[in-house]
Amino acid sequence: MNKKQKKVLIRIIAASVMMILFAFIPVEGWLEFVLFMIPYLIIGYDILLKAFKGIKNKQVFDENFLMAVATVGAIALGDYKEGVAVMLFYQIGELFQSYAVGRSRRNISELMDIRPDYANIERDGKLERVDPDEVVIGSVIVVQPGEKVPIDGVIIEGSTTLNTSALTGESMPREAKAGDDVISGCINMTGVLKIKTTKEFGESTVSKILDLVENSSSKKSRSENFISKFARYYTPAVCYGALALAILPPVVSMLLGFDARWGEWIYRALTFLVISCPCALVISIPLSFFAGIGGASNAGVLVKGSNYLETLSKTKYVVFDKTGTLTQGVFEVVGVHHSKLEEARILEYAALAESFSSHPISKSLQRAYGKEIDQSRVTDVKEISGEGVTAVVDGVSVAAGNTKLMKRLGIEYSDCHSVGTIVHMAVNGRYEGHILIADREKPNSKEAIAQLYRMGIKETVMLTGDTGKVADQVAGDLGISTVYSELLPGDKVAKVEELLSKKHSKEALAFVGDGINDAPVLSRADIGIAMGALGSDAAIEAADIVLMDDDPLKIAKAIKIAKKCLRIVYENIYFAIGVKIVCLILGALGIANMWVAIFADVGVMVIAVINAIRALFVKKL
């Protein structure tokens, strides 16, 4: 509890003790009024001040105004105990709500406790602690065992085990050695590391993640926007309704010659006011989303706003980019089928020609070549999107790519019956063979697809630039229902738009990619999910939801979290509105008294808040 909450608690205890004591003192009239005004002012002075300021600023209709009118009215009717009780229980509810929100915020802060407090820089043979913001790109920082890695960089000395659980939600540590990239927010567990920074702190992974989580509350869901608008019109409506309930029945009774019974009808109107307070909805709905986003963060699923959580819960179609999402994206050369030119020379030409590309296939060719790449040997490089590359290597014309490239160049090629990615090679316009490259499926991909179907996903779709043979085999192995192969990057956007046009307006389509070249498709889908986005700025920028590791099972987990959060939101909406409608009718009929009204207001709010906090707990999903 913070200092403000402790002060409110002391006031609640003091007012409660006084109220109980004064209830046993046999006094009446003005003395009873004076006695009960003491606990009333102790517990309610701030509510009265807020109500007065609201009236002064022409912002009349809020819960403070409702409570002030209801309690002052009850005291004016001589119902001192009820007046104090309404204010007392309202403050108890507010304290509970404040504590619950603070607790969920603390939980999220603890879960996302990845912001480093300092960075160690070596100066004159000594380690000096500096603010991470002061460290420039290219600086060498030292990270001791037990410390957080403060800034993204490359390990230049040392080896260790890194704990990435605060980022990924997974407890499995990761080995790291000299030459490996390392991201901020990880905890160094064993060895001393020297890291050369590659980013400023403000651009590092930890800063982007914290900024994403902190700003998530600004993007509100349709449910939250509905409740905000609802409260804006609902509160004035019930105030006028209560006024009508207090005035019209007595006036009609007088006109008909009956007893007006003003006191009874005013009491009913005050009860009506207390019951109608919209706190349960106004507080619990945003809290449900806030807790849901916090729970997702703990599981390594970063959600940029409650609107995305709401859309994700409606997902019925999941579209995957194959490479790096369902497969490991680690391509390996598994065979070289050559004619006259020897295998080593084909690999050399392919590796050099592809050396200017960042595509995983080019990386695999360079690994298979196994020697240092001298790019000065390569000239006139032309990369043709979705086909391959042409270049001049040591004065020799080289073409490396798929069948489309061979057809473009008018070169006759041989088909390969093995399943994998085929890189056809032509040297000086003559076909010299092909290189077979294979990607491995991720261990959990098949189970991830099965989980999606068990959750009610209607269709899974795989988009890939690979050949139909490779794509069909992967889709068949994993149980994917629809596959589109041999697509150019631009074709993927067109396919997603085609799928979007077929679905029902109340259903959502999610696209899952690894963030590499996927930004246009991530932006076009109803929900863009970037997988394994640790350290990927483009993915964090383009996606609506970021999975911090590359486990496909996290996709189903993210949808389960969204569904649980929305289920809690609707439970609170139906429960709060249902109880209030029943109690409002009973209050208007004179059946419900002020004590029932207290339950309908404070009791419902407390129950709704407790229910909302359940959204934090997602480990067993």
Question: Model regions: which residues?
Answer:
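Helix-interface capping motifs at the ends of transmembrane segments in multi-pass membrane proteins
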Residues: 17-34, 41, 53-62, 68-83, ...
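Membrane-embedded transport module
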Residues: 241, 503-506, 543, 548-621
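Conserved cytosolic catalytic loops of P-type ATPases
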Residues: 110-203, 307-350, 392
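Conserved catalytic phosphorylation-site environment of P-type ATPases
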Residues: 66-68, 167, 267, 277-353, ...
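Conserved ATP-binding TGD loop and adjacent catalytic N/P-domain core of P-type ATPases
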Residues: 395, 421, 427-571, 579
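P-type ATPase nucleotide-binding
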Residues: 333, 337-459, 468, 480-496
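Juxtamembrane coupling segments of multi-pass membrane pumps/enzymes
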Residues: 87-145, 176, 303, 373-376, ...
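Transmembrane helix-loop-helix hairpins at the membrane interface
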Residues: 2-118, 220, 229, 236, ...
